[in-house]
A protein has these predicted regions:
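Hydrophobic core of alpha-helical transmembrane segments in multi-pass integral membrane proteins
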Residues: 19-21
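A residue-level marker of the well-folded mature domains of exported/periplasmic proteins
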Residues: 2-12, 23-236
Length: 236
């Protein structure tokens, strides 16, 4: 039986972390949801890095976490969908003008914009998911990163034990630091499982160079299924 294994664990984890960490802490080409201007409750907003809040993936899980936080704490939450990178800075600036208490950037593509905004507005608080500035993190920024290689290792290990063709696949979105973690963990898990059961298992890897082109991802998977019976994707 052919199987596609997706990054469900990452999506679920993002909901829990986003909902928990919030306790500590417009319009050109974009869609914005706003609260009431005179509402004095704690106000948190998120901005997407190109995807929408209905992407059935990272952005949607983040927004679900925001809504849960709002329900649990009676705070205000909002979002801005920005399909173009050129929209990032202008809309983060608009959120700053709205006196947002905490501004979230969802995705590593927003790193430069978050860093610039944080330095420009030191009195505001910012956070970014899936990125860390390391030792250069501004004092008013929190970076949230995931140990994606660990969950991917488990997926690879299971794939090694389940494969009947001794060939499994990995489909990535855009190659880079974030998706490299998924590929590395998956390959390591397959290798560990293969060694344990005494098999040679091939791992085929291909990138779509997109997080939104589902047709290309499907085409890659269909071709990969000529040899593979299990595919793991980290592609949005």
């Amino acid at each position: 039986m052919k199987k596609i294994i997706s990054k469900v664990s990452w999506i679920g984890l993002s909901v829990l972390i986003l909902a928990g960490i919030l306790f500590f802490a417009v319009k050109t080409g974009c869609k914005i949801a706003t609260g009431v201007d005179d509402d004095k409750r704690f106000f948190t907003a998120m901005i997407t890095d190109g995807g929408g809040i209905n992407d059935q993936s990272f952005q949607q899980s983040s927004w679900e976490g925001m809504k849960k936080f709002s329900k649990d704490t009676n705070s205000r939450v909002s979002y801005v969908e920005c399909p173009q990178t050129s929209d990032f800075l202008i809309n983060i600036d608009k959120l700053a003008d709205e006196h947002t208490d905490l501004i979230w950037g969802i995705g590593y593509k927003l790193a430069d914009t978050i860093e610039l905004a944080a330095k420009t507005n030191p009195e505001l608080n910012y956070a970014i998911a899936d990125f860390s500035f390391g030792d250069k993190t501004p004092e008013n920024v929190t970076g949230v990163i995931f140990r994606s290689e660990e969950s991917s290792f488990l997926v690879g290990y299971i794939a090694a034990l389940m494969t009947k063709t001794n060939s499994v696949g990995f489909v990535g979105g855009i190659k880079g630091m974030v998706i490299d973690q998924f590929e590395y963990g998956y390959r390591a898990g397959v290798a560990y499982g293969a060694k344990q059961i005494g098999k040679n298992i091939d791992v085929k890897v291909q990138y779509a160079e997109s997080f939104t082109d589902s047709a290309k991802g499907k085409a890659i998977a269909i071709k990969m299924f000529d040899d593979c019976d299990i595919i793991f994707h980290a592609a949005g």
